[in-house]
Amino acid sequence: MTTTYAIVDIETTGTDPKVDRMIQFGCVLVENQKIVGRFSTDINPSQMISRQIQSLTQISNRQVQKAPYFEDIAQTIYNLLQDTVFVAHNIHFDYHFLNHELVRCGMPRLTIAGIDTVELAQIFLPTESSYRLNDLAESLGIIHENPHQAASDAEV
């Protein structure tokens, strides 16, 4: 049986899933070292995005104004991730935040296996001075055109 890896990144209005909301979801599906699918979407957080987050992510309130609410795409995201291995850079944030959003919408938590690319980088690249995604991409010669955009971060 082929393993499908779901490389995920989310952007949020802040770091506390109790009060903050997702504003972007990006996922790249990989099987046998080949990209087999992609899914990304802006998400209307039903709250204002702070200037700090807008500056960091380049995601504006206007951009997400007509985007779907998380509850409208929760089932799609849940189905996409079922039977995959969840891969993220700092998985503890993305996996926890996403699960919190799913439960908030009345969905079950994800219970899939996960891999943290920060931990992998620390093991395989122990001499790096920074494990931020942007810094690692630069160090490895990977072009990262849109940092802090979920689809771009997942692709990198």
Write out the residue ranges for each language-model feature.
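Acidic, divalent-metal-coordinating active-site segment for phosphoryl/phosphodiester hydrolysis
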Residues: Q149-V156
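A short, structured active-site edge motif that brings together acidic residues
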Residues: T111-A121
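Short Asp/Glu-rich motifs
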Residues: I73, A121, V156
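Residues on a specific face of well-ordered alpha-helices
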Residues: E119, Y131-D135, E155
